[in-house]
Amino acid sequence: MASMNQPQPYMDVHSHLSSGQTYASHPATAGALTHYQYPQQPPVLQPTSTYGPASSYSQYPYPNSVASSQSVPPPTTSISSQVPAQLLPLPVTNHPVPTHGYGNNSGTPMQGYVYDPTGQMAPPGAKPRVTATLWEDEGSLCYQVEAKGVCVARREDNGMINGTKLLNVAGMTRGRRDGILKSEKVRNVVKIGPMHLKGVWIPFDRALEFANKEKITDLLYPLFVQHISNLLYHPANQNQRNMTVPDSRRLEGPQPVVRTPQAQQPPSLHHHSLQTPVPSHMSQPGGRPSLDRAHTFPTPPASASSLIGITSQNNSYDWNPGMNSSVPNTQPLSIDTSLSNARSMPTTPATTPPGNNLQGMQSYQPQSGYDSKPYYSAAPSTHPQYAPQQPLPQQSMAQYGHSMPTSSYRDMAPPSSQRGSVTEIESDVKTERYGQGTVAKTEPEQEQEYAQPDSGYNTGRGSYYTTNPSVGGLAHDHSQLTPDMTGSPQQNGSGRMTPRTSNTAPQWAPGYTTPPRPAAASSLYNIVSDTRGTSGANGSTSDNYSVASNSGYSTGMNGSMGSNKRMRDDDDDRIVPPDSRGEFDTKRRKTLTETPVGGPVGGVPLGLQPMKAGGSLISARR
């Protein structure tokens, strides 16, 4: 290569260097490689030619350049037809190749192009790129043309042009620019609004004069075209802001206007039509419609990626049935999020029908990993949607220290120590106190009818309220009592009075210390019987339990709770050895015969009167 370049004149070597620089970014060009691949060939450019053709080939990296490089004799025709297109510094449509300086220095750039001072004709190779936006503050449509990275706007109503941005395209200094604009007689200063609309607006004619004076009219094409609205087309080339042009303006196609310059300049525009789609003009139509489709195409929700396990699939829109099998493996998801995701998915063929999706969701509830925990087996009544949809089997409920109520009232297995210590002595008290005939027959049906609907909730109450002070206190106070003292086969350890040995009424108190309250009635014994009594000293609080119509129960209940002194005596007498069982029974029976000093008019049936909770707080308080 050195031997080939040695005997050649300086200009020829220089042309080789310039072509080597420009063709570095176009490896597909064959015109520049002919020197090095075929040494016997003559040089591409004659020594007498200027630098323009060498730089003009860099603009058109297509097979045409090979043909023109072989036809060496008429280089001047290529100069006249192609150099002016290359000399126009259009940063958007041309490759960033630093070859313009050579063409400008040669003195030949303006030979084939007649400068249009009116701005109506398109420069060679320039495509009309105009966008429009609605200037809401002024209530006018603005046409925008970008040149050298500056957006110059023109108003539709009065044709005024932003002179500040116009002179910025010319590269004028700030002081000179402001001085020129201040001397304008007709001007409109805009200080509030978008950045490209701020500045000093001058009339159309003055703006055209400034553009011609600064030689930037061709750069600003088609800003000065009279009917610029005809150049508006679908905003595929707009990447700065959303278009607000009416649909009628968007549909006005550019075909008749854009193709007229191509008929005038067929050689140069032919190359430009091949070259300009590469840098930026065609990249914008490719990107813009994809954004529009992204807004409308059914996309899975954000949390559906973790819900479904999309990573194992080829396409995120392929909702195959295998996704349902992966749903139960995602641990932290709850049922609500999955159902809301199913609702957010559009009902198009790209998604699974809701029936199949919900069947996959049902696998949460019967899982042993959830149902074996007390937190998920039964929920409070305020959240019924989380409760299990099938009643849990009795075997699984034995873990919580509660036995599920069955049809027979006597076969409940002994519960755990804590709950057993709360409830064992109650059955003995009730069986001996209310052993008179008809009470034992009618009372279980009442309790079953009242307490059975709550069994789904009461089973889980122990897990929510295990830290209840009343239950804990009673469990420790009376844990020393044995079944021998109470004589009860089922319940142990507490002297609190409950309805009989049936298992439905004791479901109230171990964890659910606030049963439904009937209407209030005043009672002297509210201090003892009400768990929510605010003061233990005065009996002015209302008895929320004693409003039923059976006086037989109320006398027994209230009489047994006669006074605080009576309660202290009972507690002292409870801790007795097993051999004094007879004396203890006679004391407990004696309370039945004592007439209370003014009990309520009507008592509550035993199934509705949770006296166990009342005794729990008092004995725990002492």
From Swiss-Prot:
Keyword check for DNA-binding: yes
Positions with biased composition (Basic and acidic residues): 566-586
Keyword field: Conidiation, DNA-binding, Nucleus, Sporulation, Transcription, Transcription regulation
Biased composition (Polar residues): 274-283, 302-345, 355-370, 404-421, 455-470, 480-506, 549-563
Any Pfam family hit: KilA-N
UniProt DNA-binding region: 163-184
Protein name per its UniProtKB record: Cell pattern formation-associated protein stuA
Originating species: Emericella nidulans (strain FGSC A4 / ATCC 38163 / CBS 112.46 / NRRL 194 / M139) (Aspergillus nidulans)
Species lineage: Eukaryota, Fungi, Dikarya, Ascomycota, Pezizomycotina
Gene that encodes it: stuA
